[in-house]
């Protein structure tokens, strides 16, 4: 049985004008996701600006998402960081709060070697009694998990999934080959159907902050054999997907949400507002697709 099938949202963190977490808005976003068929909510991940949340804020966001979701969909806690002890503590607390599973990005900046990466994920897995999803995004972390590391970790009973965002489809095929037991999820919104052709169960998506139902339907169409319909959706939204990564995530998606009236605030420094040129492009894309709150 899969961890989940479908499109999970890498949920943004909304902020007030004075840069504090806007919990009233966060609850609105959770309700919007549930009403629009999201298959999982990822709390306090990269798109949630976890790197600029304090440890207390991070755990508050995770706890809030679990409490407000009320088991209506899966909640996956983003617990990875570049300090193994902190990642273990985040994972333990998330599990205690009731997270369905935890997802840990590879340690960034300090670039652990193979033994260090194996130790990092092993400690996380040993700290919880729920499934663990590895998250590989080399463009942001500077770390690409070797196939040996992935194979070794896949043999730990509760390391059951990987969110893969390298953009390297041949590497994805290698992962499926060496670790067939892992549930695979696309971490790239522009590669959902190609990765599903190699066995992915779905996507953990940035664009689902705006189009959760469309992404859910795309994945379900593919899983149910309506592959051509899924491909049509992938192609239809490709310009939207590109626009959401015109600058560093989550700045474009938050800008788009603000244009649409979600009023989620700005990103925390060092992520600044979009350039005027890119803001205008995002606005034009929103209008092109007729996207509304």
From Swiss-Prot:
Keywords: Amino-acid biosynthesis, Cytoplasm, Diaminopimelate biosynthesis, Lyase, Lysine biosynthesis, Schiff base. CDD domains: DHDPS. Its main location: cytoplasm. It is an enzyme of class 4 (lyase). Pyruvate binds at residues 47, 204. It comes from the Bacteria. Transmembrane segments: none annotated. It is found in: Cytoplasm. The keyword Cytoplasm applies. Pathway: Amino-acid biosynthesis; L-lysine biosynthesis via DAP pathway; (S)-tetrahydrodipicolinate from L-aspartate: step 3/4. GO terms for biological process: diaminopimelate biosynthetic process; lysine biosynthetic process via diaminopimelate. The active site is at residues 135, 163. The keyword Cell cycle does not apply. The record marks 46, 109 as: Part of a proton relay during catalysis. GO terms for molecular function: 4-hydroxy-tetrahydrodipicolinate synthase activity. Belongs to the DapA family. Catalyzes the condensation of (S)-aspartate-beta-semialdehyde [(S)-ASA] and pyruvate to 4-hydroxy-tetrahydrodipicolinate (HTPA). Homotetramer; dimer of dimers. This is 4-hydroxy-tetrahydrodipicolinate synthase. It comes from Brachyspira hyodysenteriae (strain ATCC 49526 / WA1).
């Amino acid at each position: 049985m899969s961890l989940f099938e479908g499109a999970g949202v890498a949920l943004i963190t909304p902020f007030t004008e004075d840069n504090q977490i806007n919990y009233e808005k966060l609850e609105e976003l959770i309700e919007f996701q549930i009403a629009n068929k999201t298959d999982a909510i990822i709390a306090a991940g990269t798109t949630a600006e976890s790197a600029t949340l304090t440890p207390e804020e991070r755990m508050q966001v995770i706890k809030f998402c679990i409490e407000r979701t009320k088991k209506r969909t899966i909640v996956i806690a983003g617990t990875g960081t570049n300090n193994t002890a902190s990642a273990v503590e985040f994972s333990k607390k998330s599990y205690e709060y009731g997270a369905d599973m935890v997802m840990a990005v590879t340690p960034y900046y300090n670039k652990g070697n193979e033994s260090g990466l194996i130790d990092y994920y092993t400690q996380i897995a040993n700290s919880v009694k729920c499934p663990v999803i590895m998250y590989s995004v080399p463009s942001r972390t500077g770390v690409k998990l070797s196939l040996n590391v992935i194979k070794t970790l896949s043999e730990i009973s509760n390391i059951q999934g990987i969110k893969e965002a390298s953009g390297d489809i041949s590497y994805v095929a290698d992962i499926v080959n060496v670790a067939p037991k892992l549930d695979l999820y696309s971490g790239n919104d522009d590669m959902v159907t190609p990765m599903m052709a190699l066995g992915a169960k779905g996507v953990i998506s940035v664009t689902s902050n705006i189009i959760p139902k469309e992404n859910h339907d795309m994945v379900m169409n593919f899983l149910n054999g309506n592959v051509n319909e899924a491909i049509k959706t992938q192609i239809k939204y490709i310009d939207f997907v590109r626009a959401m990564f015109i600058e560093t995530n989550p700045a474009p998606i938050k800008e788009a949400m603000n244009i649409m009236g979600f009023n989620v605030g700005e990103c925390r420094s060092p992520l600044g507002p979009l350039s005027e040129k890119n803001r205008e492009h995002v606005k034009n894309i929103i209008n092109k697709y007729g996207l509304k709150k």
